[in-house]
Amino acid sequence: MDSDQGSPAQSTSDFESGLKDDDRLDLRIWLRLLTCANMIERRVRQNLRTDFDTTLPRFDVLAQIDRAPEGQPMQELSRRLMVTNGNMTPLVDRLEEEALVVREPSAKDRRVQHVKLTDAGKSALEAMIPENKRWVSDLMQYVDRDRASELYDLLGDLKESILKSEAGK
């Protein structure tokens, strides 16, 4: 096999490998990040569906609510998950119908609804979290831990660069 093409698995999902010149390094990095993120997300979605009969958005909502035991305002959930309130409402409606969450009016502003996990919601999330961690760890098991730590730091640098770039607009 030609060394430029890599392994068969790589050639089917490694869109950036065809871009070789250094002038396109930024684009190659972005495409590699996107490819890896999509591959991980696809596996997590499949596993959540198969093992827990749930979806990634439902898992994400439960996990975000869990970060604030006093409850998360609907608007804050939307902001954290980067979706509109219109997308969040039906999702929370379904979670409430399944008794995984409850909505309570804010003590400070009764127009604001705080979403809290029920005991059933906590139990469901507690079952999913270690499995999610295992799935992601399994996907990254062949990356040397020191290199993974470097990658984490580099991605932090990238995030900082993006935030500075956005602030400069």
What residues fall within each predicted segment?
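N-terminal helix-turn-helix DNA-binding core of bacterial DNA-binding proteins
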Residues: 38, 42-84, 168
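Charged, amphipathic alpha-helical coiled-coil/dimerization segments
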Residues: 2-17, 93-153
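C-terminal effector-binding regulatory domain of bacterial HTH transcription factors
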Residues: 1-4, 164-169
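Alpha-helical linker/hinge and terminal dimerization helices associated
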Residues: 40, 44-47, 81, 124, ...
